[in-house]
Amino acid sequence: MNRNIDELRTLMSISANASESEIMEAFDSIANYLKNYCVIKTKDEKYRILDFEFYFFNQNHQDITTHPRNSEALCWYINDFGGIDLNFESKVEVNNEPMVKKGFKTYSCRYKLSSDSYFGGILIRQIQRLSDKVIFDGPLKVAELFRTLNASHQLQDIPILIIDPESLEKLEFASPQRHNILGSHKDITKKVDYNLQSCFEKVDDSERADLINSLQKILDKESTNRCYRYCWAGLKAK
């Protein structure tokens, strides 16, 4: 099959009403691309993606650990923790009316969940520079590629994702669980409440309960049918 970036972009355009099985199938196809065909290219170097995690929310897959965003497919996204995501096509209603604080208008951004909401991205956890095999381990190390961009013009040398299987040796990948998915909360209910309070307009009690139940089901499935994270087998998964 002739692999190309447009096919990957189509795979990254998961709809608001896609079923869970369709989402899992898309994850699997996208993972095959990232493991075996894609590299990140800068002006002077190429980098292989060695560890990545899937995050996606829609009405049939309510993974509320996913950061809300609005984006076309295949855009880079600096997430709330300073790491780099590769975005799915994402659409969610946003209220960015300024807040008045101490007499000044300040920027505020609150997202509104609905049956039409769909958003997400792929967190890049580890990459390897192909020229010397140096590994950048952890989302903040990966973000070093995006640290310094020219402030004087818009034609910047931003890293891009390209199809380049000839640069990649064959590697075996494992599928561990996503790293530290609940963060410091260690509890699904607390994690859901934290994300809702941090990013979203208030939801009613029944919606909150649905989000808690949905996340529990996702994490239960992830523990047995691991298809949310892929890392090369030489990495000791954290």
Question: For each predicted feature, which ranges?
Answer:
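A cross-family signal for N-terminal binding/gating loops and helix N-caps
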Residues: M1-K238
